[in-house]
């Protein structure tokens, strides 16, 4: 991975410029005489730096004494802090996350996913109410403030600007994290995974370019999306025989287009198939696996169902949505025939994209599909049903136990993770990937069964806001949230070897 970004100033350059042409007392002249750096002796430069460091420390100590974080002292660098909500697994026995036994063969891990909003995608007309909160020099500090406050152990970021990669690397390293970043060569932003380097060590990494992979060696991408998945494997440190124990972490950002349901369904198959392939290697036998990111999908839509249900059955309006998306024709620009620009939501405002007979509603109640469109949908559904892995949404399976008024429908997911100017809802998820055991999983699995089957215990969740709690204006906004997305974080306890979760109850 290329960690260098053009146009950045090195620490030595910053240090050099910080003393150049500044006011400083002189031994031979009056105080506050402006002396060029070239005229200062080494001892004078050293003295100036020491005085400045002392002043900075005095300011920091003053802020700390006031109960403020000295790195984020002003109101514009604050955000709405959300509490951690622990699960009480068994009220009758008085067990809480603090009293559930932690053994040498278990590890607590806080998992976060966060779409940080790429600065290169921001257009003022898309964020008319955000004002100065859109400026990177402020927003970036708030994003780091969030990470410092919530302290995840593994974090997957989407929409990370390549030209700000040094910023992310430096700040994650200050927090004790190692990072890996990948992007499609046609995009200005990409995916980043960071991990606590006291708990984990990188083992391997894979990148999937969805556009260049045939699903089932047959079904190609219908348009150029430039979407990818980044998958890594991490060894656990401090666990007995750690060489055989770790986690597989997949970070992805699926196609955004309103008529992109079929493509998102195809991309979700590709990332699940790759995780299944990795897990089939003897080296990764028994490793826990997670898939997270921005799926641009709501819980009632086909891609979410394809990740979480076996067998996948599409019928009625759900199937109509997929077939309708197949009938949509993308522009020549998006397909790469006329432009090499980074096509995003901000670049395609028209629904018709030049065709007068385009579908107008991406979620029709019914749709008259062609024979070929029906066959293609059937083929993709069959591919999903051929998989031996599926996802369990960590929020979906247990969030209702800690925040029931914000756990919605049969899926149990919170109401939102995106609060934008034109749309609000849930798009982001953290899935635990488990074997499907050839069982019918269309009905939601009980939490205790999930934990026992997978040697995992859910400890708690970062609280998600309800729609009623959100301001009328969109995000980001000063003092509220630094992105139009809201981060999700779940703490889980992973068990290894012969230790079983149910034996601890």
Curated annotation (Swiss-Prot):
Residue(s) carrying Phosphoserine: 62
Spans traversing the lipid bilayer: none
Comp. bias regions, Acidic residues: 338-347
GO annotation terms (biological process): polyadenylation-dependent RNA catabolic process
Comp. bias (Polar residues): 10-23
Entry protein name: Probable RNA exonuclease NGL3
Further facts: Present with 414 molecules/cell in log phase SD medium.
Enzyme class: hydrolase
Superkingdom of this protein's organism: Eukaryota
Residue stretches of biased makeup (Basic and acidic residues): 36-54
Family to which the UniProt record says this protein belongs: Belongs to the CCR4/nocturin family.
The keyword ATP-binding belongs to this UniProt entry's keyword annotation: no
InterPro entries (alphabetical): CCR4/nocturin_mRNA_transcr, Endo/exonu/phosph_ase_sf, Endo/exonuclease/phosphatase
Gene Ontology molecular-function annotations: poly(A)-specific ribonuclease activity
Region (Disordered): 1-75, 334-369
Record-listed E.C. numbers: 3.1.-.-
Keywords: Exonuclease, Hydrolase, Nuclease, Phosphoprotein
Encoding gene (name): NGL3
